[in-house]
Amino acid sequence: VFDSSVNEKYIVLSDGMGTGKRARLDSLFSVSLVTRLIQSGMSMQTAHRLINSMLRVKGWEESFATLDIMRLELNGGTVQFLKSGAAQSFLFRDGGLKAIGGQAFPAGILAECTPDVSELKLFDGDVLLMTSDGVEDATAREILRCNGMNAQEIVTALGAKALAQRTGGRRDDITIIAAKIFLRD
C-alpha cells in the first residue's frame, strides 16, 4: 500500500507462479518494481508492460507472476483495477457483491500481455477486497455477505475460513487485503 500523490492511493498484490523461493522472489520483485515505477510517475499500464518484459528476460528459468493493482482516486471517488492473471477482487456495497475479474495472463508469459483494466465509482461504506488465488471465490462471497463487519473483521474471518478449507496438503499462500471507503467531511 502506497501513495503516489496526495489524491492517489495504490494497493498492489502479486503472486509468483509455482511454489518455493522462485515464486516468492518473482512476486517480491514485481511488487517492489511496480511500486517504484508508479511512485516515479509511470502509469499502471506502462509499469505492467515493463514488468512483463523484465520477467520474460530474467534468468534462464521461466518467471511468471500475477499482478493485481488497485488505484484509489481519493478526490474523484473512483477505483481502477489492473489485473494480470490475478484472482477476482470484490466490491461489497449495501448487501450486494460485485466480482471484479479478468482473463489476462500473468506477467512474464507472453511477449505482449494486455492486462484487464476496469473502473468503478465508490460510495461511503463500500468495502474493497483483494485476494490471492489461495482464497476461493465462494469463501469470499460467504464472508462478505456478513453485514456490519469492519475491514479487519472481514480479513480475519476470511483468512480463518480459507485456512480451514485447505485440502490434500495444498499449501498455497493466502493473502487478503481489505479497504473500507469513508466519505470525507
Stretches with model-predicted labels:
Residues 104, 108, 172-185:
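Activation on terminal intrinsically disordered regulatory regions flanking enzyme cores
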Residues 16-40, 122, 126-171, 183-185:
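Active-site-proximal, acidic helix/loop segment immediately C-terminal to a metal-coordinating Asp/Glu
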Residues 1-6, 64-67, 99-139, 167-171:
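Acidic loop->beta-strand submotif enriched in PP2C/PPM serine/threonine phosphatases
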Residues 12, 83, 128-130:
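Residue-level marker for buried hydrophobic side chains located in beta-strands
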Residues 24-94, 163-172, 178-179:
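Catalytic core of PPM/PP2C metal-dependent serine/threonine phosphatase domains
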Residues 17-18, 86-89, 96-98, 136-137:
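Short, surface-exposed beta-strand-loop junctions and turns on beta-sheet-rich folds
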Residues 6-7, 74-76, 184:
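Short strand-connecting beta-turns/loops that link adjacent beta-strands
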Residues 1-17, 22, 28-32, 88, ...:
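N-terminal entry segment of metal-dependent catalytic domains or homologous docking segments
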